[in-house]
């Protein structure tokens, strides 16, 4: 038991602390529940987006294999080496989700026309162009997926932190404060009874002396 002065002022302070702790506990539980709901919604978005990325990459690789069949592996490799994108840009910003700051990614200059990819369009299979187009689309989706998965990680960390704070209040801080409040209330009651009996004893002695004085 924490050492505390059993006074009415201390009891009032404890009552206010309990009220504040219970209010904080309620707000944190609401925040935790809202974070969990948001977390599972974003998990669902990530799952859908991951399926899209996998499907798009599968289509792109299928077209790439067909282009290799028509053009040959060496020609496809040469075209791929020529197709580097120097204009590709990624901007990073932040947004707020339920009080959690998460990054946002914006990618630019991903999609290009046939003549902008660095290799000559002449003598190149249309399947190579299709593959390049689908890889570009997949890159946009992957950037979006990276943003969502980073948000998931940060939200999960915030949920864990909030749960710990809720549990600390619910199972440690509030019970401890209530225990102290009970202890002080009991001590004040004891002190009040002691004072009552002491005053009663003093009154009895005074009355006895007065009675003895009257007798003399």
Curated annotation (Swiss-Prot):
Q: Which UniProt keywords apply?
A: ATP synthesis, Cell membrane, Hydrogen ion transport, Ion transport, Membrane, Transport
Name a single GO biological process: proton motive force-driven plasma membrane ATP synthesis
**Gene3D superfamilies, A to Z:** 1.10.287.3240
Annotated thermal dependence: Optimum temperature is 80 degrees Celsius.
Its record classes its membrane topology as:
Peripheral membrane protein
A Pfam family the protein falls into: ATP-synt_D
Report the superkingdom from the record. Answer: Archaea
Q: Name one GO cellular component term.
A: proton-transporting V-type ATPase complex
Which GO MF term does the entry hold, naming one?
ATP binding
Domain free text:
Purified ATP synthase is 25.9 nm long. The hydrophilic A1 domain is 9.4 X 11.5 nm, the central stalk is 8.0 X 3.9 nm and the membrane-bound A0 domain is 6.4 X 10.6 nm; the domains are connected by two stalks. ATP is synthesized or hydrolyzed by the A1 domain while ion translocation occurs via the A0 domain.
- List, alphabetically, the PANTHER family matched: V-TYPE ATP SYNTHASE SUBUNIT D
- According to its UniProt record, which protein family does this protein belong to? Belongs to the V-ATPase D subunit family.
HAMAP family named among the record's database cross-references? ATP_synth_D_arch
Q: How does it assemble?
A: The A-type ATPase is composed of subunits A(3), B(3), C, D, E(1 or 2), F, H(2), I and K(x).
Cited function: Component of the A-type ATP synthase that produces ATP from ADP in the presence of a proton gradient across the membrane.
Designated name of the protein: A-type ATP synthase subunit D
